[in-house]
Amino acid sequence: MSTYAIIKTGGKQVKVEVDQAIYVEKLDVEAGAEVTFDQVVLVGGDKTVVGTPIVQGATVVGTVEKQGKQKKVVTYKYKPKKGSHRKQGHRQPYTKVVIKAINA
């Protein structure tokens, strides 16, 4: 059974495994840099450890592969019979991280 972990980043919880690529909310680091996630909620495998609320001493290490923006989401509001309308687009920034190690 492979080791996995659940980490908290960007206000979300993400299940990760070694050599997995994940997309998280934008982190303030350059591409190629190493990033450490220390808010580990759960470490699973042969023996599962659940944190209260986080697992003490557990970290997940990854490498930032790239920074980018998601596809554009378009919102459109209008009020009938008033000639009022509004169109707005949004592209959410993200960081692609490849998980290298789970230290429990």
UniProtKB/Swiss-Prot annotation:
Cellular component terms (Gene Ontology): cytoplasm; ribonucleoprotein complex; ribosome
GO MF terms on file?
Answer: rRNA binding; structural constituent of ribosome
- Keywords, ordered alphabetically: Ribonucleoprotein, Ribosomal protein, RNA-binding, rRNA-binding
Gene Ontology biological process terms, A to Z: translation
Q: What Pfam family is a match, any one?
A: Ribosomal_L21p
Q: What SUPFAM superfamilies would the database entry show?
A: L21p-like
Q: What does this protein do?
A: This protein binds to 23S rRNA in the presence of protein L20.
Assembly, in brief, is: Part of the 50S ribosomal subunit. Contacts protein L20.
Xref: PANTHER family:
50S RIBOSOMAL PROTEIN L21 (PTHR21349), LARGE RIBOSOMAL SUBUNIT PROTEIN BL21M (PTHR21349:SF0)
Q: In its UniProt entry, what is this protein called?
A: Large ribosomal subunit protein bL21
Biological source species: Streptococcus mutans serotype c (strain ATCC 700610 / UA159)
User: What gene is this protein a product of?
Assistant: rplU
